[in-house]
From Swiss-Prot:
<protein>
    <recommendedName>
        <fullName>Cbb3-type cytochrome c oxidase subunit CcoP2</fullName>
    </recommendedName>
</protein>
<dbReference type="Pfam" id="PF14715">
    <property type="entry name" value="FixP_N"/>
</dbReference>
<keyword id="KW-0677">Repeat</keyword>
<keyword id="KW-0408">Iron</keyword>
<keyword id="KW-0249">Electron transport</keyword>
<comment type="pathway">
    <text>Energy metabolism; oxidative phosphorylation.</text>
</comment>
<keyword id="KW-0997">Cell inner membrane</keyword>
<dbReference type="GO" id="GO:0005886">
    <property type="term" value="C:plasma membrane"/>
</dbReference>
<dbReference type="InterPro" id="IPR004678">
    <property type="entry name" value="Cyt_c_oxidase_cbb3_su3"/>
</dbReference>
<dbReference type="GO" id="GO:0009055">
    <property type="term" value="F:electron transfer activity"/>
</dbReference>
<keyword id="KW-0406">Ion transport</keyword>
<dbReference type="GO" id="GO:0020037">
    <property type="term" value="F:heme binding"/>
</dbReference>
<keyword id="KW-1133">Transmembrane helix</keyword>
<feature type="binding site" description="covalent">
    <location>
        <position position="232"/>
    </location>
    <ligand>
        <name>heme c 2</name>
    </ligand>
</feature>
<feature type="domain" description="Cytochrome c 1">
    <location>
        <begin position="130"/>
        <end position="209"/>
    </location>
</feature>
<keyword id="KW-0479">Metal-binding</keyword>
<comment type="similarity">
    <text>Belongs to the CcoP / FixP family.</text>
</comment>
Length: 305
């Protein structure tokens, strides 16, 4: 901030503290040194106030807060451009420096443990109980907001506990997904195949997983199959089982990221979808991602209950 505003904040802060000290001392003058049964002379609804001095503990508490405030403003940045003199923080304390200090301490304490697991194959790490506990905590802190605390996903966010993987479920593939993220784009087709085509393809796609067309809706499954063969097989494959290299889902199973109702599939066909998994390398680093990949991999290796 500019020098003017720095001095403004400084003088205002110190002036306020000085005013409070003056008020405290001024009101203390003239008070009785000892307690008395006399009142100040006024009564409200039968309630009278004794003419006694401020309790000493109350007065000392007030003084203590003033001393604390002055000490705080000396140690921490609170007076304009004053950076404070808190030991251990070159150039003054800041939230960023405090965070970095805590991170450095944590890395010093846990870094060797992360490095130990990073040197092991993901499959082997996935069998280590301590590693899974650490990976679970990383997941809860960084991934559960999208995939859920139980990792079973939600609308638009995949379930990580089954064996259905858009980009592949091999350990190193999972690690790559977490490290670098994924960008999946499903184009909209309403301007290409029209509303009738959307309806027919939706009916055909639902039929691939054994779903019937809702009553009252007329579709041409054969025509939908032709449109699918002409436009959709390049991503989803000729058998509609998906292509992991492109993140295109299998349309013949019962796993639906954006819903399997007739209306939801039409919505997907009409306007497309744009799914994005953010990269975590810059946030977590390779060693933590390695541990997290092992945890995610372990979720789909557990026997069904």
């Amino acid at each position: 901030m500019t020098s003017f505003w720095s001095w403004y904040v400084t003088l205002l802060s110190l002036g306020t503290i000085a005013a409070l000290v003056w008020l405290l001392l001024a009101t203390r003058k003239g008070q009785r040194p000892d307690s008395t049964e006399e009142t100040v002379g006024h009564s409200y609804d039968g309630i009278e106030e004794y003419d006694n001095p401020l309790p000493r503990w109350w007065f000392m508490l007030f003084v203590g807060t003033v001393i604390f405030a002055l000490g705080y403003l000396v140690l921490y940045p609170g007076l304009g451009n004053w950076k404070g003199i808190l030991p251990g923080y070159e150039g003054g304390w800041t939230q960023v420096k405090e965070w970095q200090r805590e991170m450095d301490k944590a890395n010093e304490q846990y870094g060797p443990l992360y490095a130990k697991y990073a040197a092991m194959p993901v499959e082997e790490v996935a069998k280590d109980p301590q590693a899974l506990k650490m990976g679970g905590r990383l997941f809860a802190s960084n991934c559960s907001v999208c995939h859920g605390s139980d990792a079973k996903g939600a609308y638009g966010f995949p379930n990580l506990t089954d064996d259905d993987w858009l980009w592949g479920g091999e350990p190193e593939t999972i690690k790559t997904t977490i490290l670098h993220g994924r960008q999946a784009v499903m184009p909209g087709w309403k301007d290409v195949i029209g509303e009738e085509g959307i309806r027919n393809v939706a009916g055909y796609v639902r039929s691939l997983s054994g779903r019937d067309t809702p009553e009252g809706i007329s579709v041409d499954i054969e025509q939908g199959q032709k449109i699918f063969a002409a436009n959709c097989v390049v991503c989803h494959g000729p058998e509609a089982k998906g292509v992991t290299a492109m993140g295109a889902p299998n349309l013949t199973d019962n796993v639906w990221l954006y819903g399997s109702s007739f209306a939801q599939i039409q919505q997907t066909l009409r306007y497309g979808r744009n799914g994005r998994m953010p990269a975590q390398e810059a946030i977590l680093g390779n060693d933590k991602v390695h541990l997290l990949a092992a945890y995610v991999y372990s979720l789909s290796q557990q026997p069904e209950q």
